[in-house]
């Protein structure tokens, strides 16, 4: 059966406005000419002129966080425990079966920035697209932030998934979710306002912290979700295997059978 692949990852670039200033990625590019000098140093007697076109290798040196670019967060990122007291798993311990499964897209692009999605809103959207959640479905949330990646207000855009909305998914067997926003939760300034008004610390990172009850992973900084149908595709999002890490980068892809 013919298949179509849709890239749902964002591009990692030096200085791309994808994170707070202290977290912006930095990439140094070593061109072929510099690579020729390095290659000559590795092989005594070699000169760059002896190499085809005087070129050596091209290499990049990168200074980034595991939370730059499109990445999969492990339960360890949110807390030291999951599943009501078990040790939270790190990214190298995430079951691979979680990372390749049928995908579902929830369209919340209409919701205002800072809105905290409820379980009732998830139910309404699932009813609209005619889908009943199945165990291990990968649920992707398309927000208003997706269209703003690389803009100076990206980290402030989009709705967030609240605790009850997250648990609604997890209680039905979902173990990987994703968003095209900077965070699975609402942007920090909106949460800060709610905390200031209530003094309720449980509102801070409430979607992330749902993993303390039922462990799960989520993808952040996805892209191109508007190109996906609501159902009928498979998501591949295997993370880079970093020992004991809280997250790993992924080239997330949606696979459609046609």
Please identify what each model-predicted range represents.
Residues 1-258:
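Active-/binding-site microenvironments in catalytic and ligand-binding cores
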């Amino acid at each position: 059966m013919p298949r179509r692949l849709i890239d749902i990852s964002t591009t990692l670039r030096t200085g791309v406005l994808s994170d707070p200033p202290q977290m912006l990625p930095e990439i140094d590019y070593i061109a072929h000419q510099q690579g020729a000098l390095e290659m000559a140093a590795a092989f005594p007697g070699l000169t760059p002129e002896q190499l085809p076109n005087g070129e050596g290798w091209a290499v990049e040196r990168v200074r980034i966080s595991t939370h730059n670019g499109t990445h999969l967060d492990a339960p360890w990122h949110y807390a030291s425990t999951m599943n009501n007291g078990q040790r939270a798993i790190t990214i190298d311990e995430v079951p691979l079966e979680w990372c390749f499964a049928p995908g579902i897209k929830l369209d919340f692009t209409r919701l205002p920035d800072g809105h905290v999605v409820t379980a009732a809103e998830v139910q309404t959207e699932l009813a609209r697209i005619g889908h009943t959640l199945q165990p291990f479905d990968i649920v992707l949330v398309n927000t208003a932030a997706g269209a703003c990646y690389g803009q100076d207000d990206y980290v402030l855009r989009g709705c967030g998934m609240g605790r009850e909305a997250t648990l609604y998914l997890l209680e039905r067997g979902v173990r990987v979710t994703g968003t095209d926003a900077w965070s699975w939760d609402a942007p920090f300034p909106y949460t800060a306002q709610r905390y200031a008004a209530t003094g309720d610390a449980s509102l801070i990172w409430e979607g992330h912290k749902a993993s303390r009850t039922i462990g799960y992973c989520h993808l952040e900084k996805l892209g191109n979700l508007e190109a996906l149908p609501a159902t009928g595709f498979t998501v591949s999002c295997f993370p880079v295997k970093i020992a004991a890490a809280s997250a790993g980068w992924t080239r997330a892809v949606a696979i459609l059978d046609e």
